[in-house]
Amino acid sequence: MEEAIMRLEGAEHRETNIHSLKRKPSRTSSTAPGSPGGVTTAKAASGAGASGVSTIRYRGVRRRPWGRYAAEIRDPLSKERRWLGTFDTAEEAACAYDCAARAMRGLKARTNFVYPMPSLDSYHHRIFSSPPMNMFLLRDVLNSQSLSPLTTFAYPPCNLSNVNDVVHESFTNVNDVCEDLSPKAKRSSTIENESLISNIFEPEPASSGLLQEIVQGFLPKPISQHASIPPKSNQQSVGVFPTMPESGFQTDVRLADFHVEGNGFGQVKYHGELGWADHENGFDSAKMQQNGNGGMFYQYCFHDDY
């Protein structure tokens, strides 16, 4: 509540100041011949016999109740007021307004002070210098002028020799780069790139990675027909197993073992396949009985022709 009351009192105090300014009698403005820079002076006609008190008013400058001066300017494009800042003296605020007006409107701007017409040389230097419309650095400009309203704003000159040196150096660098890109250099760089790519990506067959190649790697190898089909002849032949020693053999294939009886051969045990031996013709009335795993088989077995 106290803050709200203080705000209301401050608002009422501002309104009274505004009314007091509006109630001041009209002033007759005249240009004093001895005033520096054509500063406009105003004399207050308070009444007969009253001594004239001269006050200076600048364009775009307003005095704050606490004694400082605020500068602002209306933007010609957006028709809005642009805040330029608060200054200690009216001359500083007037200079800030003049800078902003000349930056927005050029030579046609209405300013508080009279400025000399810039020559062609100064205009040429101004193009290469920093942009003039820098309203946020007006304090630095005003401080360098020692608060003098008659001092003209001189922009820092641009050293064209430095610019030429920079441009010449940039062009020489471009020429060096162009010389490096000669046909020989391009050819050598192309060869190096191709060799690098060939080392990274090794050549592979056209059918690599196909499903057929993957499936064939897991399929068992086909058995040759020469080992499975017996030769035909009119005589009695003997089937010989080349991989079996004289005493017998034992294969790696885990198949069922059988007990064979008949034709005076007695009992023999074998493990694995018998090749092309035909038990029906080779063993008359043979009786085969499963008899567990493992066993031996003699090297020769007789086989009758078909």
UniProtKB/Swiss-Prot annotation:
Key word S-adenosyl-L-methionine present: no
Upper lineage: Eukaryota, Viridiplantae, Streptophyta, Embryophyta, Tracheophyta
Protein's name in the database: Ethylene-responsive transcription factor ESR2
Family in the record: Belongs to the AP2/ERF transcription factor family. ERF subfamily.
Extra remark beyond the main annotation: 'Dornroeschen' means 'Sleeping beauty' in German.
GO terms (BP aspect): cotyledon development; cytokinin-activated signaling pathway; embryonic pattern specification; ethylene-activated signaling pathway; gibberellic acid mediated signaling pathway; regulation of cell cycle; regulation of DNA-templated transcription; response to auxin
InterPro entries for this protein: AP2/ERF_dom, AP2/ERF_dom_sf, DNA-bd_dom_sf
Source organism of the structure: Arabidopsis thaliana
Compositional bias segments (type: Basic and acidic residues): 1-17
Residue ranges: DNA binding: 57-114
Positions of region (Disordered): 1-46
Pfam families: AP2 (PF00847)
Subcellular location: Nucleus
Coiled-coil blocks: none
Role played: Required for correct embryo patterning and cotyledon organogenesis. May positively regulate the gibberellin signaling pathway leading to germination, hypocotyl elongation, and leaf expansion. Involved in the cytokinin signaling pathway that promotes shoot regeneration, probably through transcriptional activation of target genes such as CUC1. Acts as a transcriptional activator. Binds to the GCC-box pathogenesis-related promoter element. May be involved in the regulation of gene expression by stress factors and by components of stress signal transduction pathways.
GO molecular function: DNA binding; DNA-binding transcription factor activity
Database matches in PANTHER family: AP2 DOMAIN CLASS TRANSCRIPTION FACTOR, ETHYLENE-RESPONSIVE TRANSCRIPTION FACTOR ESR2
Sorted UniProt keywords: Activator, Cytokinin signaling pathway, DNA-binding, Ethylene signaling pathway, Gibberellin signaling pathway, Nucleus, Transcription, Transcription regulation
Expression across tissues: Cotyledons, leaf primordia and shoot apical meristems.
Primary residence: nucleus
Assembly, per entry: Interacts with class 3 HD-ZIP proteins such as ATHB-8, CNA, PHB, PHV, and REV.
GO cellular component: nucleus
